[in-house]
């Protein structure tokens, strides 16, 4: 499981608020947070870069720990 929700909560933001920053619908962010959908590498990088710009100090590995994808495949 990824740590998007944990990072979002640390910022004190709702899913709706963070989704707006990305220009996404709240449901897309929810799907990523719950693991219903897996973000591609580009989306993962965008998420981490944005979290850092918003004041979090995180890395790709801290938000998306290695082995996060249940089937073991890297998404792109």
Which residues does each PLM region occupy?
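A short, Lys/Arg-rich alpha-helix, primarily the initiator
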Residues: 1-10, 58
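Residue-level recognition of specific faces of alpha-helices
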Residues: 3, 28-31, 47, 62
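Residues that mark the N-terminal boundary/hinge immediately upstream of a DNA-recognition element
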Residues: 3, 14, 40-43
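Residue-level detection of the helix-turn-helix DNA-binding "recognition helix"
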Residues: 5, 9, 23, 34-36
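The alpha-helix within a helix-turn-helix
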Residues: 8, 19, 48
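Short alpha-helical DNA-recognition segment
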Residues: 12-31
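DNA major-groove recognition helix of helix-turn-helix
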Residues: 33, 43, 51
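Short, charged recognition helix plus adjacent turn
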Residues: 37, 41, 49, 56-76
């Amino acid at each position: 499981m990824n740590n998007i929700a944990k990072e979002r909560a640390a910022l004190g933001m709702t899913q709706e608020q963070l989704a707006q920053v990305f220009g996404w619908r709240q449901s897309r962010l929810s799907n990523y947070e719950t693991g219903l959908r897996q973000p591609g590498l580009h989306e993962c990088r965008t998420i981490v870069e944005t979290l850092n710009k918003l004041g979090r100090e995180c890395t790709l590995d801290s938000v998306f720990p290695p082995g996060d994808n249940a089937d073991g495949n890297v998404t792109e």
